[in-house]
Amino acid sequence: MRRSSGMTIAWAALVLVLFSQGAYPARAPAIDGDAIDGDAMIAEYFEIETTRLRDACLAEITSLEDWEAKRSEYRRQLLEMLGLDPLPERTDLQAVVTGQTEHDEFVVERLHFQSSPGLYVTGNLYLPRSRSEPLPAILYVCGHGASRRDGISFGNKATYQHHGAWFARHGFVCLTIDTLQMGEIEGIHHGTYRYDMWWWLNRGYTPAGVEAWNCVRALDYLQSRPEVDPDRLGVTGRSGGGVYSWWIAAIDERITAAVPVAGITDLENHVVDGCVEGHCDCMYMVNTYQWDYPLVAAPVAPRPLLLSNTDRDSIFPLDGVVRTYEQVLRVYELYDQRNNLGLQITAGPHRDTQELHIHAFRWMNQHLRDDDSMIEKAAFKFFEPQQLKVFATLPEDQKNTEIHETFVPAAPEPPVPLDDPQWSTMRDGWLQALREKSFRAWPADPPDLAFEVVGSAVRDGVRFAAYDFDSQQAIRLRMYMVQPDGPNLPQRIVVHVLDDPALTEMLAAYQVAFAEQLSGETLPEADAEAYRVQVEALVAAQQAHVYIAPRGIGRTAWDPSPRKQVQHQRRFYLLGQTLDGMRVWDVRRAIQAVRAADGLPDVPIHLHGAGTMAGIALYASLFEPRIAQLDLGDLPADHRHGPYLLNVNRYLDMPQAVAMAAQHSRIVLQDADPQDWSYAKNVIDALGWEPEALQFRQ
C-alpha cells in the first residue's frame, strides 16, 4: 500500500540507513575487512557475566537478620537447582547387608539400599569392634577414583576405603558410598561433557541431584542403625566427594560437621580460568538462580565447616578457594561463630594426600567426639577391591543406568483449555516460568542497540546493507538487509535466523554482487543461480529480507573444535544460561533493531528459521509483539532435539510453545508431521481461533 508523500519521503531517506540514528551519507563506507575475533568476544562476555554474578553473591546480606530471613529460600533454591524440589518420596530403603569383611579392629558390612525404587546405592559400613554406646557417624562420599578389573566395577568406595578404615579405628561408624558413575552399577555423570545429552538442561537435570539425594538417604540409613548416635553426623569426601559434601551439608541440617576436600571454587575459576573443562556434570547444579559458589557453602553456617585444599590443585585453584572462604566467613561472623569455620591449605596437586587426611580427622574428632588429641595412626588400605564388593550379580530392576531419564520428570502434556480464561491462566503460567526459570539471565536493563551502518551498495535493482548492533554487553552482531531499491516501503520484512548452513547459502548467493559488503565473513564459492533466484523473488514480492546470525555463528564464531564448542556451552550453563537461550535474546534484539527504524514499526515482520533456529525464532516471537508470521522448517517436535533452554521441559514442550505463538502469529510449519502438533491444533480449534493460525506445507 502506498503511503502519504511525507511518509514516502521519510522512508526514502531512512530506509537506506535502517538502523542508524542520523541520515545515511550519500556514499556508504565499505565494511572494515577485519573480522571479529569470536574467541576474544566470548571470553570478554564470560568475564563480564561472571563478574556480575560474583558481585551479586551475598551482596544483599548485611546482617544476621538479613541472612536468617533468606536462608530457607536459599536452601529451597538449591534444592530446586539440584532437581530436588519437591523432594522425592522417602520410600523404604530396602537395605540389605550382603556380607562382612573382617579386620582385627573393625568389621565392614557390604550393603546396598535404594534411595528411590530401583536407584541402588552400594556402600561399605565400617563398624568399630569395640563399642559400648551409640557412636558418631561419618558419611564418606567418594571422588572420581574408579576401581575396575576385567570389566567389573568394584566401585570407588574401594579406592577410598582407607578413610572408612581410619574412622572405624578411631571410634566412628563410617558409611562409604559409591557414586552414580563409578559405582558397582555404572550410571552416567558425563551427559553434556561427553555424550551430547544437552537435553539435560531442558529437563533441569544434573547428576549432582542424584548424588545429593543418595546422601540424604544415606543419612536416613545411618540414623536407622542402633550403633549410630543420630545427632552426631559428619560428612567428608574429596574431589567429587568434596562437591557432594557441599550439597548434603547445605541442604540437610542433620550434618553437624563437614570437611569438603578439594570440592569448591568460584565461578571465576570455573568459567573465566577454564576449570570447567576439567570437571564433569556432577560438579554443578542447574544454576537457575545464577549463584556464585560461596552461596552453596554459606548455608552450612554456623555449623563446623573446614574448607580443605592443596595449593597447586589445577581444578580447584587456591585463589578461588580463598575467595570462597572469605565470602563464607562473612556469614559465620554474623553468627559470631568465627571458630566454626576453618581453612586448611597444604602443599600439593589435586591428590588425596596424608596432609589433607590429618586435618579432616582432627576436625571430626574435635567436633563430633570432643577429642583434641594428636593423630597417631595413618590411613591405610587393608583390603583388595573385590573384598569390598556388594553384588555378586547386578540387580535386573536397577534404574541407575537410566536415572537421568526420570529423576527430574518432564511436565506431562496439559489438557486442552475449555475456554479463554483457562487458556490465559495456562499461557501466563508458562510465560512466567520461561522468564524466571529459562531466560532469567536475559539482561534486565539492556544497553542501547548502538546501531551502526557499516556498508551499503545498490546493484541489479536491489540495495544490500550491513549493520552492526549490540545484543548485550560484549556481544556485537551484524545483520544484513536486502530490499528492492526505491522509495516505497516493503510489503513485509522477512527476518531470517541463520545457522551455519543457512548463512553459507546466503553468503554464496549475495557475494556474487556484494562481496565488498560481506567482507569480514568467510565466503564460500559464489552461487550465481541462487543470487538470480533470490533477487527476482525479492523484487517481485516487494519484500525486505533481514539476515541475522546469532552469537557464535559466522563472524562471531569461536574455536570450532568439538571440545571447545562443548566447554563453551557448559560455561553458559554455569552462568545460569544456555547458548540457545541467549541466541533467542539475540533474535529479539534484531527484531527490536528493525522496529526502531522510522517508518518500520507497522511493517509486518515474518520470522524464518530451520531446525534449532526455527525453535529459537519461535521463542523469540513469544516475547516480541506483532510478529505476523512464523515460517519454520524442520521444527523439532520436542525439546530433546533442541533448542536447549534451561528447565523448559519442567513446564512445557514445543507444542505448547507453538500454541502460544499461534495466538498472535500465523505459523507455517514446513516438512512437519501434523500429528506432532495436534495439541496446538486442538487449542486453536477449542478456542475458536483462525483455522489458518497453524498451517502445514511440504
What are these regions (language model features)?
Residues 217-289, 590-663:
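Primarily recognizes the serine-hydrolase "nucleophile elbow" in alpha/beta-hydrolase
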Residues 1-11:
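Bacterial N-terminal signal peptides that target proteins for export
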Residues 188-226, 554-598, 619:
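Alpha/beta-hydrolase active-site loop
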Residues 24-121, 133, 295, 301-303, ...:
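Alpha/beta-hydrolase-fold serine-hydrolase catalytic core, especially in secreted/extracellular enzymes
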Residues 10-21:
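Bacterial N-terminal signal peptides
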Residues 139-142, 177-179, 261, 495-498, ...:
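Alpha/beta-hydrolase
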Residues 114-179, 201, 208, 229, ...:
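A conserved hydrophobic secondary-structure block that centers on an alpha-helix together
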Residues 166-184, 539-557:
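Conserved alpha/beta-hydrolase
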